[in-house]
Amino acid sequence: MPQLLLLACLLIIVTRVAPRALDPCSAYISLNEPWRNTEHQFDESRGSPLCDNSVDGEWYRFTGMAGDAMPTFCIPENHCGTHAPVWLNGSHPLEGDGIVQRQACASFNGNCCLWNTTVEVKSCPGGYYVYRLTKPSVCFHVYCGHFYDICDDDCHGSCLGTSECTCAPGTVLGPDRQTCFDENECEQNNGGCSEICVNLKNSYRCECGIGRVLRSDGKTCEDIEGCHNNNGGCSHSCLTSETGYQCECPRGLVLSEDNHTCQVPVFCKSNTIEVSIPRDLVGGLELFLTNTSCRGVSNGTHVNILFSLKTCGTVVDVVNDKIVASNLVTGLPKQTPGSSGDIIIRTSKLLIPVTCEFPRLYTISEGYVPNLRNTPLEIMSRSHGIFPFTLEIFKDHEFEEPYREALPTLKLRDSLYFGIEPLVHVNGLESLVESCFATPTSKIDEIMKYYIIQDGCVSDDSVKQYTSRDHLAKHFQVPVFKFVGKDHKEVFLHCRVLVCGMLDERSRCAQGCHRRVRREASTEGEDASGPRSQMLTGGPISIDWED
């Protein structure tokens, strides 16, 4: 009877020699555009809003008419040459602090931090700052610069010899001992606010979450008891009931997860993103995406916009444990500016940020069986989806023609060609097959497992990995085998795939083969806070092992 032969592990160690890092205080890119300054207010009649889509993880310094440094207070929307200006939500570091991380926030629609990301900041010996800025996940976002006041007249004591400048209330003296920077009151005890503290220029304010309002002290929050108080916190309709109140949305809109805000439904699929907007909400407006050639099509009741991860100016980025695809629906009046057809006050336009989130980590399972259903991973939801991966069984080592309707019955010592295939080819992303294992049943938690790949390393030296032009695709060849026992005539494959950004040298994908000293007791289990896994089950692989 054929037996399962366990082969020796092959450990491949790749040593990288990192180039010597340059000091960002002397190796930076200057941002000197005048429209970046906080004093520059965006005017719709003079052009389109700008977007920092060329900023991509380098070190930058604000110079010239752009300003001295990033503002550390909330900037109103429609400033810095764009709709959503980005400011630094935290104080600048001292020179001795080295490189620190700070949150950067984009202001829009009355929310000082509607979108946020993490940037790095360093104080340089010349009295200036440099910033490592990430590319915004959506447009229209611009990193702002600001001119801070120079304190060269007001001094403590004698101004002869060693003078010490003083700054106005709400500001602090910078490291150059001349510039007055805004003081971030929110960094100390949250500004005394019970919930949200928003730093403003030379001041701050307290805010409350959805369904809550500030008390008269301006610092503590209390629950909204019903629709009579600020419409119950509802963005649209508030209905009173015997047990309390509830928010409702107009026809065609859906209630968001906060149960107070109505929003346009977004359908995130594996290969398409669809936005469906009720026509009566956008009457007189022409809708288009970041790439203005992608426009909405009306079906009589709704205006629908269909696009993919690679089209219409969609920005794809890796954020923590998710792949985030973003775009912006813009609606402009078909009439002349300022006409009664405008439905958005102040901007005379409709702006709908569209975001789909896809988990980075997948577990996909497959086997060989006639009439195999090999559908791509796919979930339809308002704002979440599954990045389109599928596990394919190929006919040969060219990995060009997969089996579709029927799969052959394989014999021992035949070669099995399989691959992890993306159905959408997106630049800037790469994948890592963290693990592949076989089981005699379709259960992923089957006790009997045989690892082909583990911790990103090939565990069986009979396995061959092929290179691919697509950084998201992975191809493998393995000799056909079966599990010990006459009843085990089937084999199922399960692979766990992780998606990363190609430019992130510290990502798990960049580490490649990475054997852990001690494996956790439940390797295939997922921590509740970790990346989510999705399952695609097929199979089984039928083995003809009779001679």
UniProtKB/Swiss-Prot annotation:
InterPro entries: EGF-like_Ca-bd_dom (IPR001881), EGF-like_dom (IPR000742), EGF_Ca-bd_CS (IPR018097), Growth_fac_rcpt_cys_sf (IPR009030), ZP-C (IPR055355), ZP-C_dom (IPR042235), ZP_chr (IPR048290), ZP_dom (IPR001507). The gene is OIT3. Residues 182-222 form the EGF-like domain. It comes from Bos taurus. Glycans are attached at residues 89, 116, 299. May be involved in hepatocellular function and development. It is found in: Nucleus envelope. One of its GO terms (molecular function) is calcium ion binding. The keyword Signal applies. It holds the Pfam family D8C_UMOD. Residues 267-516 form the ZP domain. GO terms for cellular component: cell surface; extracellular space; nuclear envelope. This is Oncoprotein-induced transcript 3 protein.
